[in-house]
Amino acid sequence: MKPVRVGDRVRVTGHMDDPYPIPVGTEGTVDWVGQWNSEYTRQIGVKWDNGRSLILLGHDPFEVVSG
């Protein structure tokens, strides 16, 4: 997977394991990236275009669309 950096644009590509997931296809801008190395502990802060607030985890289904 391409490294994620602050300022990158990301898109949700599948169902997230969350009771109130971000809808598939939603895009946002990476605001911060945690310093954890594991795919299961890495956290990515995103400002979602729909106004929602929910971090991405490294194992969530998403792609970097521009950066």
Regions found by a protein language model. Give the residues of each.
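Basic/aromatic-rich interaction segments and small domains that mediate binding to polyanionic partners
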Residues: 2-67
